[in-house]
């Protein structure tokens, strides 16, 4: 019996030493989850279910939170804190969702992603545009015309800046472009090799509560504003993020492009979500390593 107790004691000591050694060997790696937990969450937005629910389904330990009519999923992805926001469609909805997310979750950064229509004939369905710039293409001053003078949208070529540096200026005529955050762009480039369904390019995302189907008008936006794609949320998100000084990047996938007969493909919504999650992971990984 004494021999049995002796051997049990020896085994217990060996086990303790072995586990201690394992913990010691993994010490450099054990700090990673701690650093991940210390990070503020990154918010990834999508306007519609087809642009948000795929991401939400991939979160671990997700909880759903409703603030007014805006839906948020809070959880982790690859160990990093992530909030998925369904902003709903349009400039006002996305601006409100962004302000709520910033106030409620204090995010480290915001990615606005989803589908878009092409303005650049060289881009095709499933190509992804990284918003080096994001701009509001729905703010402009029309020319003066008398009753009976008609209306021609191709003459609406004076952009109106709704966020002027000089608020005393009664007519701030300028194209306001919000620049994509450089660290988020770097993360997007790190994720680029994993995306194989199309190109990933930098460009300008144009936003407005308008669905443009006039090819001459689209060509004008592409020429004057330099737009690659159009959609209905990113510029308002960029504007709110800018005022709260939160890093921002717009990521848009071409779901259709009438400039080159690119037909709508509903699978683009999920493809962009997968890429956006990859970008978020790369960004959070870099932030954790920098701590």
Regions found by a protein language model. Give the residues of each.
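N-terminal short beta-loop-beta anion/metal-coordinating cradle
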Residues: 33-99
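A C-terminal functional module that forms or caps the active site or interfaces directly
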Residues: 208-250, 259
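C-terminal motif of bacterial Sec signal peptides marking the signal peptidase cleavage site
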Residues: 18-21
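Bacterial signal peptide processing site
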Residues: 23-25
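Proline-aspartate-enriched helix->loop->beta-strand connector
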Residues: 106-108
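Bacterial N-terminal signal peptides that target proteins for export
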Residues: 1-10
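Mid-sequence, gly/pro-rich, charge-dense loop/helix-turn segments that line enzyme active sites
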Residues: 120-218, 222
């Amino acid at each position: 019996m004494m021999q049995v107790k002796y051997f049990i004691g020896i085994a217990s000591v060996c086990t303790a030493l072995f586990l201690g050694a394992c913990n010691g060997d993994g010490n450099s790696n054990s700090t990673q989850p701690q650093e991940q937990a210390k990070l503020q969450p990154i918010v990834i937005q999508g306007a519609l279910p087809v642009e948000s629910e795929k991401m939400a389904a991939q979160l671990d330990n997700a909880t759903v939170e409703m603030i007014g009519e805006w839906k948020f999923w809070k959880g982790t992805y690859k160990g990093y804190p992530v909030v998925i926001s369904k902003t709903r469609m349009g400039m006002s909805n996305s601006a409100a969702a962004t302000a709520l997310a910033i106030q409620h979750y204090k995010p480290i950064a915001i990615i606005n992603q989803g589908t878009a229509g092409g303005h650049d004939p060289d881009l095709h369905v499933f190509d992804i545009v990284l918003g080096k710039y994001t701009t509001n293409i729905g703010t402009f001053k029309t020319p003066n015309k008398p009753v009976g003078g008609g209306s021609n949208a191709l003459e609406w070529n004076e952009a109106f800046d709704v966020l002027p540096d000089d608020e005393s200026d009664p007519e701030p005529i300028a194209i306001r472009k919000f620049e994509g955050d450089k660290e988020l762009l770097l993360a997007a480039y790190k994720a680029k090799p994993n995306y194989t369904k199309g190109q990933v390019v930098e460009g300008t995302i144009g936003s407005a509560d308008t669905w443009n189907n006039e090819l001459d008008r689209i060509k004008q936006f592409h020429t004057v504003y330099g737009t690659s794609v159009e959609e209905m949320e990113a510029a308002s998100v960029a504007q709110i993020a800018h005022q709260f000084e939160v890093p921002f990047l717009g990521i848009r996938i071409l779901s259709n492009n009438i400039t080159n007969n690119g037909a709508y493909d509903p699978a683009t919504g999920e493809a962009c979500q997968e890429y956006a999650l990859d970008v978020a992971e790369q960004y959070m990984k870099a932030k954790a390593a920098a701590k």
